[in-house]
Design a protein with these regions (language model features):
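Short N-terminal "domain-start" leader segments
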Residues: 2-11, 15-51
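Pocket-edge positions in alpha/beta enzyme catalytic cores
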Residues: 16, 71-74
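Generic hydrophobic secondary-structure signal
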Residues: 24, 28, 36, 54, ...
Length: 118
């Protein structure tokens, strides 16, 4: 699926191709890198409610954004839900989550393909 999605984080507008969960999981299992982007800063008063999206980086340098089965962008609203999805559904070896709007964290891989740094 190669529709485009406009992401507005601060003043920057980016357009990424879309990927559904099944293809995303396959890409990650093959060794693709995962990035999590914070769209709206987590609110401590609201039990860490914020907004995050997940991107995957293909080997060709292309970035794809996760969408639901209905081609709607998948935005995670709760920190806990994002952690559970990344750990159990995507089976990431480690999870890094940005907490400030506009920030992102990269370098996450499938737990069986995690580069050994230690």
């Amino acid at each position: 699926m190669f529709l485009s999605y406009s992401l507005e984080a601060g003043m920057k507008v980016r357009s990424f191709p879309l990927v559904q969960e099944a293809e995303l999981r396959a890409l990650i299992a093959e060794g693709a890198e995962v990035e999590i982007v914070c769209l709206h800063e987590a609110d401590k008063e609201a039990r860490n409610r914020g907004e995050w999206i997940i991107l995957v980086h293909r080997a060709e340098g292309e970035r794809l954004v996760l969408v639901s089965s209905r081609s709607k962008h998948r935005i995670f609203l709760r920190f806990e839900g994002l952690c559970a999805y990344a750990a159990h559904t995507l089976e990431l070896g480690e999870i890094h989550i940005p907490m400030r709007e506009g920030e992102s964290c990269r370098g996450m891989y499938h737990r069986d393909r995690q580069p050994r740094t230690r």
